[in-house]
């Protein structure tokens, strides 16, 4: 009996594609206010508070679906994940505008996340890093830089 229930919970790839990837999308599909969404962190199990849910959206992170259970990533675990990925999967570093040569694309077309908090860098943040000659790191085949919030941790404002 438990095996049948377990088999019924397995999610197919087609069904997975139809599930919402954002908290906003989830709240709309459930017909509930965004503020009422309680989503556990995939790593520590703590429920994201309202501010963390908003940060999750601003960072353009995607929800994680395991069977039909949804998970996100809290602020603390975003930082821990970023650090772990950097330490385990570092590939290369380039300075400033050299990222365009390394990636073979314009800075406007390159997706870059913050190496500290995983926020998605906007064009102003990317140009700021280029103009200051700050490092961009290739980690797990993705580019990392430093966002406007985290650069204050490095006393670089």
Swiss-Prot record:
Keywords: Activator, DNA-binding, Early protein, Host cytoplasm, Host nucleus, Host-virus interaction, Inhibition of host innate immune response by virus, Metal-binding, Modulation of host cell apoptosis by virus, Transcription, Transcription regulation, Viral immunoevasion, Zinc, Zinc-finger. A zinc finger (unnamed) spans 41-77, 114-150. It comes from the Viruses. The keyword Acetylation does not apply. One of its GO terms (biological process) is symbiont-mediated suppression of host type I interferon-mediated signaling pathway. GO terms for cellular component: host cell cytoplasm; host cell nucleus. Transmembrane segments: none annotated. One of its GO terms (molecular function) is zinc ion binding. It is found in: Host cytoplasm; Host nucleus. Belongs to the papillomaviridae E6 protein family. HAMAP family: HPV_E6. Forms homodimers. Interacts with ubiquitin-protein ligase UBE3A/E6-AP; this interaction stimulates UBE3A ubiquitin activity. Interacts with host BAK1. Plays a major role in the induction and maintenance of cellular transformation. E6 associates with host UBE3A/E6-AP ubiquitin-protein ligase and modulates its activity. Protects host keratinocytes from apoptosis by mediating the degradation of host BAK1. May also inhibit host immune response. This is Protein E6. The lineage of its organism: Viruses, Monodnaviria, Shotokuvirae, Cossaviricota, Papovaviricetes. The gene is E6.
